[in-house]
């Protein structure tokens, strides 16, 4: 890195960069960071050897599923869950989840992701791992009406974790409310959680209309689609972010736009499991904020948001038989500023003075990134997680390629991460 540091003032700069700037502009020059924020964007004539872009925001993941990466490949969703995933998850302990979470957080940071919305058991383990490794996030305790006491656990977990974060000032990591899906929570649970959320005031993280079967069975049960049903329970009153939305209707999209519910597009996972994929261009036409997510890496099988951008771009062009659908800038914003909006992240998602310095820095000297005629096109169609050389979260270097062996200098958790992961896999009998 050609980087100038001033350790006393915590002011430093990233020099000789292409920069993805507001207004869908590509600039050249330096980004100056002071403390947690961007202090200056200095445009000048230079020969860039790197790209600085907003940090990537993964709006739907099950991070600890690094433990089961690739398990059950080739099975459709319901068989994949019932035969491969649920039996292993039933054996997972908090220690196992922590090991998988730390490994997944490191994988994401090494690929330029600065924030993740995670849905998994033992959310406190994920939350603490995020604060220790140095990443932003939204966690949640998964709402399931068949688990005794889960409603009360969800409410208390959200309240107590967020109070801990605020009192300890450990970073932008908060717990949102969550139900797994319409089909795993009954109406009584949804309405009770919605009522409790009048005090908590948190957005909802939920799976919606991932498969045709799920979508149609909800209509048979309630006479309405999952989105319409959830809206009627009041659980969307403080907004949210809905993963998948593969089978959502135009009316569903209108409800989402009205309620401030973002659509989280998971193209790789949906394609791998044969579910189809969300009608993203139509959702955008109807005013829905669309973000991107990897889903769990057991159905992906990585946490590479560059790959997610690439696949999202290709499938909608191919379906429409129109190369103008979802231009590169749209897809980049889905992975950055739209994701920040979906999760309620403050002052981030853009490279502008005063914004928080959540940044992804890419090495432009790689063979496959030259010539650089069209930077947005390169981001979406040529770049990958392995091209990232620096990830910055709130002005702090969270990952730097060429630091210690894994790029996480000074992070004690990282030192034992691989051994912890493999030990957990062994305990689970995999």
What are these regions (language model features)?
Residues 210-240, 245-258, 271-282, 296-307:
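Catalytic core of soluble alpha/beta enzymes
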Residues 1-29, 33-34, 335-430:
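Active-site microenvironment of metallo-dependent hydrolases
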Residues 125-246:
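Metal-coordinating catalytic core of metallo-dependent amide/deamination hydrolases
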Residues 17, 31, 36, 49, ...:
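Divalent metal-coordination and catalytic microenvironments
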Residues 67-99, 106, 133-147, 212-237, ...:
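Active-site gating loops and adjacent loop-to-helix segments of metal-dependent hydrolytic enzymes
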Residues 232-239, 281-366, 382-383:
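His/Asp/Glu-enriched, well-ordered alpha-helical/loop segment
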Residues 69-135, 157-168, 417-422, 426:
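Alpha-helical scaffold segments that flank or form the walls of functional sites
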């Amino acid at each position: 890195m050609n980087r100038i540091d001033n350790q006393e003032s915590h002011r430093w700069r990233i020099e000789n960069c292409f920069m993805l700037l507001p207004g869908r502009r590509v600039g050249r020059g330096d980004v100056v960071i002071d403390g947690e924020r961007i202090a200056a964007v200095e445009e000048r004539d230079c020969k860039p050897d790197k790209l600085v872009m907003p940090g990537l925001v993964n709006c739907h993941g099950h991070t600890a599923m690094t433990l089961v990466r690739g398990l059950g490949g080739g099975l459709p969703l319901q068989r994949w869950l019932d035969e491969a995933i649920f039996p292993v998850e039933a054996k997972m302990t908090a220690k196992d989840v922590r090991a998988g979470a730390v490994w997944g957080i490191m994988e994401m940071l090494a690929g330029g992701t600065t924030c993740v919305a995670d849905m998994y058991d033992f959310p406190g383990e994920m939350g603490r791992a995020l604060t220790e490794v140095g990443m932003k996030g939204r966690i949640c305790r998964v709402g399931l009406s068949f688990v005794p006491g889960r409603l009360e656990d969800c409410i208390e977990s959200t309240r107590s974790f967020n109070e801990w974060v605020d009192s300890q000032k450990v970073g932008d990591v908060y717990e949102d409310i969550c139900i797994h899906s319409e089909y795993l929570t009954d109406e009584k649970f949804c309405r009770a959680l919605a009522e409790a959320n009048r005090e908590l005031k948190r957005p909802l993280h939920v799976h919606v209309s991932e498969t045709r079967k799920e979508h149609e069975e909800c209509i048979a049960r309630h006479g309405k689609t999952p989105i319409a049903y959830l809206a009627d329970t009041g659980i969307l009153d403080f907004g949210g972010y809905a993963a998948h939305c593969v089978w959502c209707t135009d009316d569903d999209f209108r409800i989402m736009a009205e309620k401030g519910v973002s659509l989280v597009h998971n193209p790789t996972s949906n394609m791998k499991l044969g579910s189809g994929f969300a009608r993203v261009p139509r959702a955008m036409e109807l005013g829905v904020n669309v973000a991107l997510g990897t889903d769990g890496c057991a159905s992906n099988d990585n946490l590479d948001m560059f790959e997610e951008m690439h696949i999202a771009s290709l499938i909608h062009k191919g379906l429409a038989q129109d190369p103008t659908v979802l231009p590169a800038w749209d897809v980049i914003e889905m992975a950055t500023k739209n994701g920040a909006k979906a999760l309620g992240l403050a002052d981030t998602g853009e490279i502008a003075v005063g914004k928080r310095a959540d940044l992804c820095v890419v090495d432009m000297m790689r063979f496959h990134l030259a010539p650089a005629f069209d930077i947005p096109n390169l981001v979406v169609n040529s770049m990958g997680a392995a091209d990232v050389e620096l990830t910055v979260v709130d002005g702090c270097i969270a990952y730097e390629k060429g630091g210690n062996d894994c790029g996480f200098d000074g992070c004690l958790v990282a030192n034992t991460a691989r051994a912890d992961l493999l030990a957990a896999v062994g305990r689970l009998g995999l």
